[in-house]
């Protein structure tokens, strides 16, 4: 069964910021990044358990998981499973302070 993908509002800001950064670097890389994110999310919706659990807080329910964006391995999708939904919390560069950012989401 394929889960429904639910993006938290801040994810749109994440994607916009990353796409803007890539647009400044090279043409069409932003489009390739967005396509890679869409493909990754589709794959996670089919197999949500394939992401790595991230123990940000002991006993955290539901557990947050992560998955690298294919072809853009410095970027990570953070999500959790809630019933029949794959809830995406953030899409961030791996060098960002993930704990701090997710604490505020």
Which sequence ranges carry the predicted segments?
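Enriched for short, Lys/Arg-rich terminal
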Residues: 69-105
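Generic structural signal for secondary-structure transition and capping sites
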Residues: 20, 27, 42, 46-50, ...
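Arg/Lys-rich, positively charged N-terminal/basic patches that mediate binding to nucleic acids
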Residues: 1-36
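Generic leucine side-chain signal with a strong bias for well-ordered alpha-helical environments
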Residues: 7, 15, 41-44, 86-92
């Amino acid at each position: 069964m394929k889960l429904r993908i639910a993006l938290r509002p801040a994810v749109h800001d994440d994607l916009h910021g990353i796409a803007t950064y890539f647009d400044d670097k090279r043409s069409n890389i932003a489009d390739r990044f967005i396509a890679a994110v869409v493909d990754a999310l589709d794959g996670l919706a089919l197999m949500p358990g394939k992401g790595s659990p991230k123990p940000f807080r002991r006993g955290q329910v539901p557990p947050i998981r992560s998955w690298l964006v294919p072809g853009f391995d410095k970027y990570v999708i953070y999500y959790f499973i809630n019933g029949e939904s794959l809830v995406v919390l953030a899409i961030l560069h791996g060098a960002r302070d993930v704990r701090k950012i997710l604490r505020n989401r």
